[in-house]
């Protein structure tokens, strides 16, 4: 007796279909740009509303924004140091807020209401292009911080405490952006796929605990990325001991 193939609902889940914009010979990932612009617009709107008519004793949205500001300031100060953290606070804050809003937006915003010719919108951080770009920005910030502070003496850290460490230090510079980008990308993509499969299989109650866990891990991933970014910048600024 031949077995008939059963149309499993989760077979509709596909990865790999994307919307591309062509500018000359350059192809841009349109889905990432669109979702990023939407989330940045939401973030800017929240900030503008929360900072309008600020009071000495904050309440409501202003209170939340001041809490986030103090939280990000502590991350930067603890890892970069009291002397230099103010210069890097906008960079660290931008990374944290963009990743946090992207992760939560990917889980909470009903992206399917936006119809595209191909593919669908989702969390920008679930795309490897976004996470690699941010990781490379952190690497550039690390080198800029070190070279602007120490000049060519910055490269002494590659041969400290002994020149034997040179190849290992060079390998480390490649593993930093790789670990930053793939950790964030893997966690967010896995969460979206897991929730998507569960929604197709049992669309009512079962996916809720997984979604709540995903929101928690998404916030943790934003914290880890911002903490490591500030740590790397602090490492470039301070003298090796």
From Swiss-Prot:
Record family assignment: Belongs to the ATPase A chain family.
InterPro entries: ATP_syn_F0_a_bact/chloroplast, ATP_synth_F0_asu, ATP_synth_F0_asu_AS, F0_ATP_A_sf
Gene3D superfamilies: ATP synthase, F0 complex, subunit A
Subunit structure: F-type ATPases have 2 components, CF(1) - the catalytic core - and CF(0) - the membrane proton channel. CF(1) has five subunits: alpha(3), beta(3), gamma(1), delta(1), epsilon(1). CF(0) has four main subunits: a, b, b' and c.
Domain of life of the source: Bacteria
CDD domains registered for this protein in UniProt: ATP-synt_Fo_a_6 (cd00310)
Main location: membrane
Membrane topology: Multi-pass membrane protein
Protein's cellular compartments: Cellular thylakoid membrane
HAMAP family the UniProt entry points to: ATP_synth_a_bact (MF_01393)
SUPFAM superfamilies attached to this UniProt entry: F1F0 ATP synthase subunit A (SSF81336)
Keywords: ATP synthesis, CF(0), Hydrogen ion transport, Ion transport, Membrane, Thylakoid, Transmembrane, Transmembrane helix, Transport
Molecular function terms, GO-annotated: proton-transporting ATP synthase activity, rotational mechanism
Protein's UniProt name: ATP synthase subunit a
